[in-house]
Amino acid sequence: MHDIKAIRDNPTAFDDAYTRRGLAPIAQSLIDKDDARRKAILASEQAQARRNAASKEIGDAKKAKDNVRAEALMAEVAELKTTMPALDAAVKDADAALKKALSEIPNLPLADVPEGKDEHDNEVRSHYGVKRSYAFTPKPHYELGEALKQMDFEAAAKLSGARFVVLKKGLARLERAIGQFFLDVHTEEHGYTEVNPPLLVRDEAMFGTAQLPKFEDDQFFVGNGNNVRRLQQEMRATIEADDVKNIPDMFVPKSKYDRLLENYLRLETEQIALELTRRWLIPTAEVPLTNLVRESILDEKELPLRMTALTQCFRAEAGAAGRDTRGMIRQHQFTKVELVSVTTPEQSKDEHERMLSCAEEVLRRLELHYRVMTLCTGDMGFASQKTYDIEVWMPGQGEGGAYREISSCSVCGDFQARRMDARSRGPDGKPRFVHTLNGSGTAVGRALIAVIENYQQEDGSIAVPTVLQRYMGGLKVISNG
């Protein structure tokens, strides 16, 4: 979320950075919405001030036994009481319109981010290692996994539909080993604190990290049908009894509860009940980890705060129709180790480089060839100021192999912190917004693919990387045995 005051102070600078993403200038539109909000606030405050003044004048008129003036003032106060709810509503509507507009605007790229339209304009920052050579034609992971009878897409489709997989035996254990290895390195050597967060979160958490409202179609949400129906019945009963203040506060925080009550006359009970009971499946552990500091004021002596989690992640992949339809590259459910850092503004640049090096290190120990890309302005994520992608070499992809993304490391500045109201207090005692960073450390499912394809043997077996063998009970080769 952007600061409207900063936009007002320098709209040209805002638009100069914003248009680097290939978007049209927007500062004046935001200023117009803020002007409308200020105008509505002024009208409401003037009406309230006049009501207060008139109420006082009524007492003065009565003391002076000026009944005519007292009656005129009482009539004025009565009229103000009638008009003020509409003025208050106008303030709320104008404030909501500005907040909605600001919430749908992406972060501004840093000055050193290369300009470009899409992934073809990303810049190679570095390489590590070399591509492996084979005396045979490497196969894709799904052919190897199915031949081993340890990767079953058909069974997964019967259970859940497309873009799911069932892993068995050695490959299931290998995926678990990769995740545990990543987690151990990050916690024991890189200074991250392990967190086991919920996989279901509220709207507020998804808004805080900027998945909502812009990317709702890419998410999975769940709602308990029985709770919805029960809550509907209780709502209707209290509405009929003209006692809406006693609607049960079952699942919702006070701030949201009050807002919903205000909208009773405009919304159907079914819609409200669903909103009260729904939760979102996390698309990444970035969401719960980053939101752990929501509505907090941290001591800057404790920063940077580094957290990591190994979780399942869920994505609808609404924009991926027809892409990567075979194999495990693009799944609705996948495992990932996430890295999150919360820093001061002065620390965030160095922390970004450090986070990238942590993600690189686990791939180096797996002896996988990869390259690091600096994403251009047209390919950056919504909340990012600057992003590095790590693309690992997968010899079984396409004709002759391909680089595929396995990690994204992004610095977000105070963009998410403003949405979450996450601040820190320094030596001067004044609170200020923190900076947030997130990165994959790395995607476990894609790391599994990379290991399968890079460590495949001519007979279809998979050699287990040395660093993973202790997690596999000493197993050195996964075969169909």
UniProtKB/Swiss-Prot annotation:
Catalytic activity: tRNA(Ser) + L-serine + ATP = L-seryl-tRNA(Ser) + AMP + diphosphate + H(+); tRNA(Sec) + L-serine + ATP = L-seryl-tRNA(Sec) + AMP + diphosphate + H(+)
GO annotation, cellular component aspect: cytoplasm
Keywords, ordered alphabetically: Aminoacyl-tRNA synthetase, ATP-binding, Cytoplasm, Ligase, Nucleotide-binding, Protein biosynthesis
Presence of keyword Aminoacyl-tRNA synthetase: yes
Ligand binding (ATP): R315, A316, E317, E405, I406, S407, S408
Subcellular location: Cytoplasm
GO biological process, one term: selenocysteine biosynthetic process
EC number: 6.1.1.11
Pfam families, alphabetized: Seryl_tRNA_N, tRNA-synt_2b
Statement: the UniProt record of this protein carries the keyword Protein biosynthesis: yes
Function according to Swiss-Prot or TrEMBL: Catalyzes the attachment of serine to tRNA(Ser). Is also able to aminoacylate tRNA(Sec) with serine, to form the misacylated tRNA L-seryl-tRNA(Sec), which will be further converted into selenocysteinyl-tRNA(Sec).
Similarity comment text for this entry: Belongs to the class-II aminoacyl-tRNA synthetase family. Type-1 seryl-tRNA synthetase subfamily.
Free-text comment on this protein's domains from its UniProt entry: Consists of two distinct domains, a catalytic core and a N-terminal extension that is involved in tRNA binding.
Subunit structure: Homodimer. The tRNA molecule binds across the dimer.
Official protein name in the record: Serine--tRNA ligase
Gene that this sequence comes from: serS
